[in-house]
Regions:
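Nucleotide-activated donor-binding/catalytic signature segment of Leloir-type glycosyltransferases, i.e.
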Residues: 1-18
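C-terminal alpha-helical cap of glycosyltransferases
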Residues: 111-131
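Aromatic "clamp/platform" in nucleotide-sugar-dependent glycosyltransferases that forms part
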Residues: 38
Length: 131
């Protein structure tokens, strides 16, 4: 990785720390959001990318299968990530489908939807308390 960082290709930028206000713009510019990490819980970066409708590619972790319900492109290793990126370059319509899946993640974790879930939960608990 040091070799790539020291001499990145022209289409790869390492911006360092980015101001939060600028992140939405950068996510919106992204052709693909790729998070290759092995050890994540539930990174906010996924929700941020989804809220900007950036297509999402992640490592194939069990956690993501449960919380994102297939609304992303799972990959097992760097080679599969590379193949998927090349596939999207050749077939941009598949990338559009992935963008639609990002919208589904954004809806699922929107303030409005989460508020509905919590209100339902508290109403159910209040009803149980009255019995």
């Amino acid at each position: 990785y040091k070799k790539i960082m020291d001499n990145p290709p022209e289409n790869l930028i390492f911006p360092g720390i980015v101001e939060p206000e600028r992140m939405r713009e950068l996510y919106a510019l992204a052709d693909l959001f790729l998070l290759p990490s092995y050890n994540e819980l539930f990174p906010m970066t996924i929700l941020e990318a989804a809220s900007c409708e950036a297509p999402i590619m992640l490592r194939d972790l069990d956690l993501y299968k449960v919380i994102l319900e297939g609304n992303y492109r799972p990959t097992t290793d760097v080679e599969e990530m590379k193949e998927a990126i090349l596939e999207y370059r050749e077939h941009p319509e598949a990338l559009k489908e992935l963008k639609e899946k990002a919208k589904a993640i954004s809806r699922e974790y929107s303030e409005e939807h989460l508020l509905e879930i919590w209100l339902k939960f508290y109403r159910e608990q209040a009803a149980l308390g009255k019995k």
